[in-house]
Amino acid sequence: MTNKEKKDWLWRYKEALLDIDSWQRELEEWQTRAEKITQVVSDMPRGGKALEVDDIVIKMTEIMDNIKAKVSESQKIKLELEIAFEGLNDGILEGLMKYRYINCLDWAQIAIVMGYSEPHCWKLHGKALEKLEVDRQ
């Protein structure tokens, strides 16, 4: 597996977190719609087909199910990453990879936390990628 393929595999966790965030924002939008409907209950006829409370509840339930599935998937990915990082058998490389791919820190932040220069962090990252064994199940 090339280093690019390894990076793609490693970034899956961040992608999963972004996906969860997107679903949570959508859920908030539906909650806002539900609040507006419950605030404006009226006998007056309206034009067009309005969303019913039942429709909104169904949609929100579907979104919550998606969020639960995505959270479960992200936890599985995180565990895969942690196992792969432990396989590096080097605490410094393991820490660097966790900061980068689990904590999603940028290079400047990693350099500060680890007490190294950014170029040295890049060098360690390259070494970690070379040593990293990815178990694609």
What are these regions (language model features)?
Residues 1-87, 134-137:
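N-terminal interaction/assembly modules
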Residues 88-103:
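Short amphipathic alpha helix immediately N-terminal
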Residues 108, 130:
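Alpha-helical elements of the RecA-like P-loop NTPase motor core of helicases
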Residues 109-114:
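Short alpha-helical "recognition helix" segments of helix-turn-helix
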Residues 121-122:
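Helix-turn-helix DNA-binding helix
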Residues 125, 132:
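DNA major-groove recognition helix of helix-turn-helix
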